[in-house]
Amino acid sequence: LEKKANEKLAVAKAAYERGDYEEAKSQIDSIKILYPKAFEARKAGQALMLDVETKAQQKTLAYLDSAFQAKTGEFNAIKDKFILEKDAEYQQVGNYLHPAQTVEKNMHRSFLRFQVDELGNMSMTSIYCGAGNIHHVGVKVVAPDGSFAETPASKDSYETTDMNEKIEKADYKLGADGNVIGFINLNKDKNIRVEYLGDRAYKTTMSPTDRQAAAAVYELAQILSAMQQIKKEQEEANLKIEFINKKKERKAQEEVADK
């Protein structure tokens, strides 16, 4: 019994040494299932399993490190095309905007503004400026072929008055925007009509600059959110390694105590 279990263990060790960690795990698991009474082989298998899991996590980390470097390279290549708005005193996380869409350049204009924070969370703001309120809480974007996308009612909207001008703003997060951001990105080279959805009808056309801003910020958001996802996976892999090391220490202490 032990002999057959040890043969399996040898196959597992060989797989481990050539870096085939899935095969090694599967061989160790089979010892437990096929030879439950081969205690020595099972014990050796458990010890090997900890080594296998450590190496597997290290391999994952190496892959994640190179993926993070690649994404960082993509980010560095385009970050200077954007303006980072961040008040160091009040904000831990700043927002990237397309230079053409800063507040100073767009006074008294009704348009869709796009931004992404440093953690990759993108949002769109529909801004309305006019002589009278329309009380809008959503927008619909329409392509020349009649296809369209429409936001749900914004959960974050407000209205104000400045020197007799009515200003309304409504925010929509990517993923809760009725795919309006994705639709604009897809149709960035086409003429897009914007219909503000409120008590009164209001329509405008997206300028080519606004369409390009949407696409550029969308691309940046994909890169930044991918970087955040990689960081999260790196943390998970490091935690797993920490957990395995603690398990190894415990086993070593138990063996000393047994002696």
Model-flagged regions — what are they?
Residues N164-D171, D189-K259:
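Internal interaction segment
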Residues K25-Q57:
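Short, charge-rich amphipathic alpha-helical segments embedded
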Residues G146-L174:
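Extended, solvent-exposed segments with strong compositional bias
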Residues N106-I134:
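Contiguous beta-strand segments within globular domains
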Residues E2-K8:
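Generic helix N-cap/helix-start motif at coil->alpha-helix transitions
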Residues L9-E17:
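Hydrophobic/aromatic side-chain positions at a characteristic register within alpha-helices
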Residues L48-K79, D87-Y90:
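Alpha-helical linker/edge segments of TPR/alpha-solenoid repeat scaffolds
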